[in-house]
């Protein structure tokens, strides 16, 4: 059985801080629950250059984004992954610009490269069926956490993937927390060390999100293997069938 590949993306441009901490807690839980079954990679936006989409149409001619920066490497990792964990700080009630640039260019370039393979000339996205989980953190209590989570969920749906959350009551649509107006880079780690109630609820949400993401990825893998003959004639499933069912 092939290993499940996990990609943890820290979308904060800051050096070692709160987002890296909560991503680390999630990946630790993934490792505890998955053991040798999972292969984990981590990607940090820190010191990376991610330019915005120019809507130039170049990717429709070559199948690749014409802008050369750190986008290409993250796109490769995203395509390889079975589970993508986005650890996202709240900026102005939503996604930070660097991550939005990646998401815009990912959708455009993948659609350009692969949509025609699915249904002739019609623009149809392949079924990537990656499990996508959002973790988010704001400085203030109600400062855009749910909106940021919904942006990631919408991204998952557009990319023909499966959004997942942890368990209620701590987690309905994704794991979201706040640093209680503290701006230190290690604020969440300190609050967790103090046993702060809302921070411990966030940690619980992160851990159950990791577990449910892993379980759903297993269901996807086993379901594809079980249904491969039925799905083989549908070009939209070609990518995931090649990924999970090839020798």
Predicted regions, residues:
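Glycine-rich phosphate/pyrophosphate-binding loop and the adjoining helix
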Residues: 33, 164-247
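A generic structural motif
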Residues: 34-40, 161
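Helix-loop-strand module that forms the ligand-binding subsite of alpha/beta enzymes
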Residues: 62, 66-172, 237
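Basic/polar N-terminal segments that are highly enriched at the extreme N-terminus
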Residues: 1-4, 247
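N-terminal beta-loop-helix "entrance" segment that forms/cooperates
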Residues: 42-64
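N-terminal beta1-alpha1 ligand-phosphate binding loop
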Residues: 4-35
């Amino acid at each position: 059985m092939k290993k499940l590949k996990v990609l943890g993306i820290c979308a904060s441009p800051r050096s070692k801080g709160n987002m890296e901490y909560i991503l680390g807690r999630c990946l630790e839980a993934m490792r505890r629950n998955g053991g040798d079954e999972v292969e984990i990679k981590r990607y940090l936006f820190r010191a990376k250059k991610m330019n915005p989409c120019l809507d130039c149409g170049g990717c429709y001619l070559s199948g690749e984004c014409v802008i050369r920066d750190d986008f290409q490497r993250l796109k490769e990792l995203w395509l390889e992954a079975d589970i993508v964990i986005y650890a996202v700080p709240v900026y102005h009630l939503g996604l930070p610009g660097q991550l939005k640039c990646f998401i815009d260019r990912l959708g455009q370039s993948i659609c350009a490269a692969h949509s025609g393979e699915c249904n002739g000339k019609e623009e149809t996205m392949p079924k990537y069926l990656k499990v996508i989980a959002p973790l988010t953190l704001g400085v203030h209590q109600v400062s855009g956490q749910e909106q940021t989570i919904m942006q990631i969920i919408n991204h998952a749906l557009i990319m023909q993937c499966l959004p997942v959350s942890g368990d209620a009551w701590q987690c309905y649509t994704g794991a979201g927390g706040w640093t209680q107006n503290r701006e230190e880079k290690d604020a969440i780690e300190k609050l967790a060390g103090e046993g702060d109630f809302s921070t411990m609820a966030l940690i619980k949400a992160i851990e159950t999100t990791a577990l449910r993401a892993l379980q759903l990825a297993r269901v996807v893998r086993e379901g594809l293997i079980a249904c491969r003959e039925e799905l083989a004639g549908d070009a939209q499933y070609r990518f995931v069938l090649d990924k999970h069912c090839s020798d």
